[in-house]
Amino acid sequence: MRFQDAARDGRAVVYAGIQADPLVARAADLLANTDGRMRVLARAVMNGESTDRETWVAMFPTLLGADVRDDIRTEAQAVLDVALEVAQRGDAVRSQVRGAIIEELTARLLARRVPADTIRRERRILFDGVRSEIHPYDVTVERDGSAEAYDCKWGARGISDDVLYQLDDARTHAADEGASLDVALVVFDARRSCAVRLARSTAPADGIRIVPLESLDEMAGAG
């Protein structure tokens, strides 16, 4: 088992520009250092259904209401500000920005558990005698004897049979070579939504760790 940088094609060049957008880093930083309530707020706003601030203040009174503790409201307002910036992007760009934010958030949380120089982005995993996958993995942890591969999705709709098969194949091929590879799907959506989506899938999922919005901080836990 070995890792390789993804091909630098036109799509990769465009997406690299999205990843380098300062908004991605600011949003990931806020989301990495907050709790589940704020992440739910961010997800709701970033969906782009409304860019009206007062609409969200009314919908999240326990975070943004006038009687909320100052420190909580200040943090929520910061999350709302960044989320509104994302929501105001055009549909296609917004989708790419959201994906880049979840990838960056994943990398930042992993960096609390493993050395930062072992975390890589947009990497393929190669196995002897096996055709390489077309799509690279969003985030990988590359350590001798203990590797990890993560695909990142904005919502549960991103849980497709193709994604699950690719993750399961990588895990299986690694085991065939006597290598350790943990595979996971990070989904910035509710656990229940992920469960409903998985229930409709026919792809193997038993060996794939699903990391929903409620469990993001587990990636930073002791490993």
What is each residue range found by the language model?
Residues 1-223:
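Intrinsically disordered, low-complexity Ser/Thr/Pro/Gly-rich regulatory segments
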